[in-house]
Amino acid sequence: MLLTIDVGNTNTVLGVFDGDQLANSWRVRTDPRATADELGWLYRGLLGDHPIGGVSVCSTVPAALREIRRMVSRTFPAMPTVVVEPGTRTGVPILIDNPKEAGADRIMNTLAAHHLYGGPAIVVDFGTATNIDVVSARGEFLGGAFAPGIEVALDALASRAAQLRNVELTTPRSVIGKSTVEALQSGMIYGVVGQVDALVRRIRAELGTPATTIATGGLAPLVIKESETLDNHEPHLTLIGLRLVFEKNTEPR
């Protein structure tokens, strides 16, 4: 079985693949201060009896990645391991001004989106940031857009407005909020829906083609049911990309 690890700024998602099927997955908080030993103890507890035969990792948090590397070498010694970083063979041409700026998670999403849906495609990843990644018909990474994630926007508003507070992120009864809580929920949910729909429409116009869209990330379910432009939901798109890149780097050439 293959262990895939996607280290994000807020959460780390782990998945275990049996062949090309995702057998199990977990979401835990990312703690850049966690040591390799602590991570090994946590991951072994989650994995239980899953017989791990390889590891594939991507990270947007450099401090966490250092300890993940140590954890893998101690907990899964001598196993085939792929860490996605500049120079890793992904099969994805990166057509931006500085290819080294492209986050590993964005390249994994590009790889998986083209594998599953072909192209052109637009990936919208709802996490700490809302990342929009554009994939060409040939599977090239063309760039995209960043916006604050829903939780980041809510935290910022609650911290700067004296009479506002964090609320549960759920769809309110109506767009017109009848309480402070509902007004916040409306602004957060429908605000992001409008933002994403507007960006997708502009990107499609710039591409000159009705590119398919794929929503992923932990907060995608909140948005996709209200969106007019999000066609598909792949909750584990990044993990699928990690499986594909592992295969590209471990299969005999």
Curated annotation (Swiss-Prot):
Q: Which Pfam families match?
A: Pan_kinase (PF03309)
Name the needed cofactors: NH4(+); K(+)
Q: Which InterPro entries match?
A: ATPase_NBD, Type_III_PanK
Q: Which residues bind ATP?
A: D6, V7, G8, N9, T10, N11, T12, V13, T128
Instruction: Give the EC number(s) listed in the UniProt record.
Output: 2.7.1.33
The question of whether Nucleotide-binding is a record keyword is answered with yes
List where in the cell it is found: Cytoplasm
Pathway info: Cofactor biosynthesis; coenzyme A biosynthesis; CoA from (R)-pantothenate: step 1/5
The residues listed in the UniProt record as binding K(+), with positions renumbered to this chain, are D125
Its predominant location is cytoplasm
Catalysed reaction equations from the record: (R)-pantothenate + ATP = (R)-4'-phosphopantothenate + ADP + H(+)
The record lists substrate as bound by G103, A104, D105, R106, T180
One GO MF term: pantothenate kinase activity
Got a GO cellular component term for this one?
Answer: cytoplasm
The UniProt similarity line reads:
Belongs to the type III pantothenate kinase family.
Query: What is this protein for, i.e. what is its function?
Result: Catalyzes the phosphorylation of pantothenate (Pan), the first step in CoA biosynthesis.
Designated name of the protein: Type III pantothenate kinase
User: What phylogenetic lineage does the species belong to?
Assistant: Bacteria, Bacillati, Actinomycetota, Actinomycetes, Frankiales
